[in-house]
Amino acid sequence: MLGAYLRGWFPMDRGGAEGPVLFYESDPRGVMPIEDFRVPRSVARGLRARAYEIRVDTAFAEVATACSGDRDGEWLTPRLVDAYTRLHEAGWAHSVEAWSGERLCGGLFGVAIGTLFSSETMFHRAPDAGNAALVGTALLLRSRGFTLWDIQAVSPHTARFGAHGISPGDYRRRLAAAVAPVLAREGSASRV
C-alpha cells in the first residue's frame, strides 16, 4: 500500500470483502497548506471554549474504526482498517486525537512518508473535536518540517482552513520532493 502512496494513489474499498481494493488519483488533488493553514474565527472560538487535549498515536485503531463508522462501509472497510493498523504498527500511519479527560472525542489518521502526510479521514463525537484534531495536525506537521499535506479532495469544510486543489502533475512533483529522503534511504519504492 505504501507503494501506491509513493505514486500518488490512495485506496478505496468498494469491492466488499471479496472484491479488490481499488486505488485512485483525484484531479484536482486536494492539499492543505501547512505554513498558511488558517483557523476560521468560529472554529477558534469553539476550540477555546472546549480546550481538547491533543494526543498522537495513543488510540490509532479506535480512531480508524470510529472513522469507518461514518462511511457505511463504502470505502473504509474492516480490511482497510486492518491494513492501516498494520501500517501504524510499522510506523507509517499515525493518528491525531482530541481528548476530553479520558474520552476520545475526535481524531484523524493518515500515512506519513518522508515529509508527506496523507490524511485519510476524520471523525468527531463532540463539538469541534474533529476541528481540534485538524488544527493539532497542522501544528504537528509544521513543527516537524512536513512539506506536503495531502487530503485527496477538497470539501467545503476543509476549504475553510485553506485547502485547495492542484493539478495531478503539480501534486506528483511535490510528492517526489516530499518522499525523496525515504527513497534515497530505502533505495526504491518497492522496498518501502
Where are these regions (language model features)?
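N-acyltransferase acceptor-side catalytic subdomain
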Residues: 1-192
